[in-house]
Amino acid sequence: MKFILVDTSVWSMAFRKKRLEADEQKLLEFLISLIRKRHVIMIGPIRQEILSGISDTNKFIQLRDDLESFSDFEISTIDYEMAAEFYNRCRSKGVQGSQIDYLICSVARNNNFSILTLDKDFQNYKKYVDIDIIDESEWLN
């Protein structure tokens, strides 16, 4: 299996949600499996998104410490340039997205990573950007 860039939506489900639905529990187990196999990739912008909005200092510190297990994959100038290209391409087709989402797409594309996400926006990006998104069938079974 190749390396997986895990999107903020998955991390948020794993770290913040108290009660998981059956499909979310399967996704959590899949994520744990990827972590154990050392297939998970982290980038700084995802780390920032995960940590943003946590007003409780103790919870912030605990989550920050938990995430220290994952070093940040280095983002290159080419990644930033391609993210801008993806943004422009998708926007011209009427698809809106965040700058960080397009950066995730770019880093994944440039480094042959798959993306694990719960964010349906990535399906819209995939129509115009060559990215590999892990299908639910891979973790629901």
What is each PLM-predicted segment?
Residues W11, R47-I50, F122-Q123:
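A generic structural signal for short hydrophobic patches within well-formed alpha-helices
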Residues I4, H39-M42, E68-E74, S114:
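Short loop->beta-strand "edge-of-pocket" segments that line small-molecule binding or catalytic clefts
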Residues L28, R47, F60-L63, Y80-A83, ...:
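A general structural signal for well-ordered alpha-helical segments in protein cores
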